[in-house]
Amino acid sequence: MTMKLNYKRVLLVGMAFFLISAFWQAYDAITPLILTNHFGLPQSVSGTIMSFDNILAVFMLPVFGALSDRVNTRYGKRTPFIFFGTIAAVIAFVCLTFIDNYQLSLLAAEGIPSLTAGTMSEEAFSLFVRETTLALTLKNPLPLIGFIATLLLVLISMATFRSPAVALMPDVTVKPLRSKANAIINLTGTAGGIIVLVLGMVFATSKKQYMHYTGYVLAVCGVMLFGFVLFLLTVREKKWAAEMEADTEKYGLGSSSDSKAADGGVKLSRPEMRSLLLILASVALWYVGYNSITSKYSVYATNILGFDFNFTLIIAQAAAIVSYIPVGIVASKIGRKKTILSGIVILASAFTAGFFVTPDTPELIMYPVFALAGIGWATINVNSFPMVVELARHGDTGKYTGYYYTASMSAQIVAPILSGFLYDSLGMRYVFFTFGALFVALSFLTMFFVKHGNSEVIEKKSALEQLDVD
């Protein structure tokens, strides 16, 4: 009897990741622009504030992942966290824009949006405006304080349900099918990101330096609530988790007795622990490289290249969407480790190519660069999380999800702070892609020595069975 992935079920579970990805796409796009353009903060300070979500995540994601392992309600273990966290995040996100609007009114009262370059160079004028804006912020810091306080509420709300949302896929999917399932999860997440990027083009978020973002954020929250409602109406967490346990027993893949691992009854062997640590180190390294690009690309494209960052990122997301399912299939044939190593090479090559794109280069040259980056990131991302939870026993999936996010979020604390400092010290033009490519390349070394985390290869009897889904 052949194991079959229920694509529809995984797609519906992925609605939680859909709304999470929609939020982060908007957050990463507009928050650095608000901090640098509306408050006049230097890149190093902006990068530090942008790392707040990762600092919170290092502590909160493992806690809420492990907590959701132990919760048992009529709606399941993960759904209650998704319910309350989403509602709180949406409300706080909208409130954030009201504070930004107040700051913009203060800038308008001082005539800052009406300033023109005159005989000044574009670079000198940009520096003059930023310093003038920063002086106004320091004179009246209350809007910035209120903005950061509300931002923390948004980030705390998101952190309460990210691990539970991601842990839900392994809860309802047997181990050998998790790379394919994770491809679908990433597909839904990328779809959420692309929708938000299209909204960014509609609202022209890359064109207006002193834009009011309330309308844009309301539209983004509408996308989030669409995924949220669809998730609540269709996902039956307890029923589907019970069916997964039955399938696990039926195919001899382990048993629910593995749940004693959550209480320390079963520990990883020394080689397994070594592989886990190497996987987590790899995750940290490639996230430092990747996040240094994604968290500041809106600033780099707008201020250095003069490009529309929204469409470039859509190209990357579209390439990733095309790649997710084939990558999951490839991993089931040649193994997750080999697939990830190839993805690292692709991503590092893309970032290296990006270094050679200058303000004088036609914008369309950046499109294949980011398409390649999207393919590389999809190849890595589809397989890295399943490698971590492959080492988990049934009862501690949430805890291992927390380990994964501790590694990735710790890296994303370092990335914006370190890269921001280097941008301020050495200039963004020459450091931006170099920094990203270097750290992605380093992850190849740690991943090369991983020995555990691959799934059993699934072989189907015929070509027709390769298309067999529920």
Go through each PLM region and give its residues.
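Intracellular loop-helix junctions on the cytosolic face of multi-pass helical membrane proteins
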Residues: 1-6, 127-150, 157-168, 172-293, ...
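A membrane-interface helix-boundary motif in multi-pass transporters
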Residues: 77-79, 204-222, 421-439
